[in-house]
């Protein structure tokens, strides 16, 4: 392989490593890193969850020996600022890494381009943009939050072969297969928040949670809920309120209520217009709560 092909190969490998954090890294991006010297992989790492070591730190640590004059591959620009963990820039510089290949810059204004410049000032060769589009797709929710000012949104819809989404008599009934329901469970696990409506909750009385045993072992917590309930008519004994370990945002146009909700229920006032709540105002609110991805499950 030539140098360009080699760079692409190892960046693709960082994508695979990054996926180890797909259920747990949120709200941080998924990041993988590899340290290579003379064609040999010295160390690999990935970011598992907030507060845990960053991928670059793990890769350098797992090398178990000097990484001087090596190349570090990482799918996202290394952090520059102090957060839950210290910035990786000093570690990379002090480790005397010779070259850093970055798939794409971090859209976070606290980071964007700053690490790139700092590394170059320290005499490290920096290459940016290898498989950039793939890297952005990998963390589409993270990029959406900073570039579009809203989370990435995925909508689920169960449709029969004749193009229907429910029975004509309004009775709730599964029209999806076991395989597709497992896909829904997986999408829920990948999303920090499920978005629905009062009509769906009242008609189907869903739990909107993760029940698949294998997925329960991988997630840190049940996804939060966002429900448009303009008049706060969802009964307090509904299944969605049974899981107390998650936040439930109720978007309503009612300023005060006598209903006694549990502490995990957050009432969010959104002024209605012509009897309807502006969904983009709900989405904007959720973006400010550090929600990168939203999975929409709502009927007609």
Name these PLM-found stretches.
Residues 6-26, 145:
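Short, basic/aromatic recognition patches
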Residues 7, 56, 84-88, 112, ...:
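Amphipathic coiled-coil/heptad-repeat helices and related helical stalk/stem segments
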Residues 27-30, 152-153:
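Short, small/polar residue-rich loop motifs at catalytic or cofactor-binding pockets
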Residues 30-39, 157-158:
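Short beta-strand scaffold segments in enzyme catalytic cores
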Residues 35-134, 254:
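Zn2+-dependent cytidine deaminase-like catalytic core
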Residues 129-146:
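Short, structured interface segments
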Residues 144, 150, 154-293:
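Active-site ligand-binding patch in enzyme domains
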